Amino acid sequence: MGSSSPLTRRNRAPPSSVSSVYLIFLCFFLYFLNFSNAQSSPVFACDVAANPSLAAYGFCNTVLKIEYRVADLVARLTLQEKIGFLVSKANGVTRLGIPTYEWWSEALHGVSYIGPGTHFSSQVPGATSFPQVILTAASFNVSLFQAIGKVVSTEARAMYNVGLAGLTYWSPNVNIFRDPRWGRGQETPGEDPLLASKYASGYVKGLQETDGGDSNRLKVAACCKHYTAYDVDNWKGVERYSFNAVVTQQDMDDTYQPPFKSCVVDGNVASVMCSYNQVNGKPTCADPDLLSGVIRGEWKLNGYIVSDCDSVDVLYKNQHYTKTPAEAAAISILAGLDLNCGSFLGQHTEEAVKSGLVNEAAIDKAISNNFLTLMRLGFFDGNPKNQIYGGLGPTDVCTSANQELAADAARQGIVLLKNTGCLPLSPKSIKTLAVIGPNANVTKTMIGNYEGTPCKYTTPLQGLAGTVSTTYLPGCSNVACAVADVAGATKLAATADVSVLVIGADQSIEAESRDRVDLHLPGQQQELVIQVAKAAKGPVLLVIMSGGGFDITFAKNDPKIAGILWVGYPGEAGGIAIADIIFGRYNPSGKLPMTWYPQSYVEKVPMTIMNMRPDKASGYPGRTYRFYTGETVYAFGDGLSYTKFSHTLVKAPSLVSLGLEENHVCRSSECQSLDAIGPHCENAVSGGGSAFEVHIKVRNGGDREGIHTVFLFTTPPAIHGSPRKHLVGFEKIRLGKREEAVVRFKVEICKDLSVVDEIGKRKIGLGKHLLHVGDLKHSLSIRI
């Protein structure tokens, strides 16, 4: 310090002078200490108990409506202070009793250590790590989606109460898994817009909804990302930072937007994150139509819009969309961006204001959305231990119930793709089980990306060894092995009653910023599988751990390979779930949430083409089960059980008449479709109403209890480039052996049977619609 030098130079003074100087120094030190303590950053915002003077501030008055509290707070801030609340590491305002706040935390499938807002310690060393989202989606169980969200938010609140976590979580990822090579497909609920929408709203509700049911309060704040048409990370040199997704309005409204709409409209999500990429030449984080127009205008978001990390910087530096940083800051804020993950807005917004590019009122609007969210979370209500979730703590993390839910989620999601009758295995008939493969004894691989520290791990090897005697050999040093230990693996398999090969991928193969270039098994794994199958004494089971699918046609057609399981990235309890299914303690019920294509598909389809619909002229085959008609390795919805289910139609109309107004144009002309909105939709069934019911009797014809997902698909008339089929609904049912029950679907005619036309408008096709459940088909005619 500058004042210390003169004092230290006085060491030559007589003793009496030294004493006087010492007393002066001591008084100065005590004064400075008291002043520093008085000015130190508060721990909790509006902690009136610790600082009674804060009670005078309107924004600290919990009796007032949140909107009034927000307005009061914004009015008290300087421009520089306001700008400090535009960035993810928000500055505190000591004079108002507001601490700093880190917005960035993640909770994709459990509380994560990704993002600076959350960390683990000896107090809370780990949190429940659920399966990666793609496997949870394979359960097709909406109540499970919500239950997982509820556990994750409880553990997050418990960690927040002891200073280890934030309240704002930038999860879930609800992008459509459009291309099988995408490295982040593992984070998503799959390729179907309805499934993705159901997952989005279900998980968000689990995270956000409070026990008291107050819709204006949040348990934690979720964030649906990455808005929008984002599904290229790094493919053959094409990076997300510069990629321009060229998307038709039809595909935008039919495929890419529905999960985000469901997040906001059905899930009441508190936040949406805009993505790095451009859409049709505009950066998503600077597009007023996408942000202010759709998210906040049409969908009525009650919360904040945040950029992906450094997205505003990216649109300036990588995309060269603006000439200056100040322009980038201004157009993003004016487009509707409220918060910048990163520091860009903190560095350049003041210059944008001084240059007249953006006014202070726009900044007020942005930070008001941020404060609104924090107030709904109780951040401005003082010590969290005195609030609704104040009793939560470390003992509420990694509870036995939470860990069992993680295991059950993996069981429900695992998909049985092939079974020649070998499965389930009988432990009594197995003396030796060979466990081979690079993923057989992995830990971190099981939890995928955006992970946290799990409560504990149970590897596939540990799960299997808990039931029967096992011998183990990796066979490959890693999933991308250049050399496989074929000799050792075949020797092991040649003496075992059954051989289990646990293979697949990990984050070195598919991840954020890492897209695949082909659909082959990595490294020498295919050769390892082929040779083990040839040499094995007994049946061979293939367990595939991955986010995306592989072309495993060779294994599908190999008679020595008796069973194939896809287990996604099954989470901390993956080994338990795998063993439970292999040994028949759990009857598999998972269904693929994405198509598994042959290698030939990706050889002719660039990842950068965003079109969903096929183009006969160019030979482009289209994407996902809704439009692709070519050969598949395994199809969307595939998944076997240890029992057999059959379906019988009980109830469904054969004809629906849409009554039109007298002056409707289609009364005097040949119309192929009608707008999917209007009086004709509200009175579409006899007796009035907009919906009808489909009843399906489901019978379990086997001798084993089972859980079955019933899919209701529809094939609409061939108009407006309609899908070859699309999912109308799905229901899960548990049936005992030889038991039957009726599953009921409510079909909203103009919502569920409509298609999106070329300009993005929903239309209900006139003519023949085909409803189908499994092999069961029913024709429905819609006319005027």
From Swiss-Prot:
E.C. numbers: 3.2.1.37
Signal peptide extent: 1-38
Gene3D superfamilies (UniProt xref): Glycoside hydrolase family 3 C-terminal domain, Glycoside hydrolase, family 3, N-terminal domain, Immunoglobulins
Keywords of this entry: Glycoprotein, Glycosidase, Hydrolase, Secreted, Signal
Locations listed in the record: Secreted
pH effects: Optimum pH is 4.7.
Reaction(s) the record says it catalyses: Hydrolysis of (1->4)-beta-D-xylans, to remove successive D-xylose residues from the non-reducing termini
Annotated Pfam families: Fn3-like, Glyco_hydro_3, Glyco_hydro_3_C
Annotated Gene Ontology cellular component terms: apoplast; membrane
GO biological process terms on file: systemic acquired resistance; xylan catabolic process
Glycosylation sites: 141, 441
Thermal dependence: Optimum temperature is 60 degrees Celsius.
Similarity comment text for this entry: Belongs to the glycosyl hydrolase 3 family.
Annotated function: Beta-D-xylosidase showing an optimal efficiency with the natural substrate xylobiose.
UniProt-annotated catalytic positions: 308
Anything else known: Might be processed at the C-terminus.
Organism: Arabidopsis thaliana
Alphabetical list of InterPro entries matching this protein: BXL, Fn3-like, Glyco_hydro_3_C, Glyco_hydro_3_C_sf, Glyco_hydro_3_N, Glyco_hydro_3_N_sf, Glycoside_hydrolase_SF, Ig-like_fold
GO MF annotation terms: xylan 1,4-beta-xylosidase activity
SMART domains linked: Fn3_like (SM01217)
Protein name as catalogued: Beta-D-xylosidase 4
Transmembrane segments annotated in the record for this chain: none
Tissue spec. comment: Expressed in flowers, siliques and the apical part of the stems.
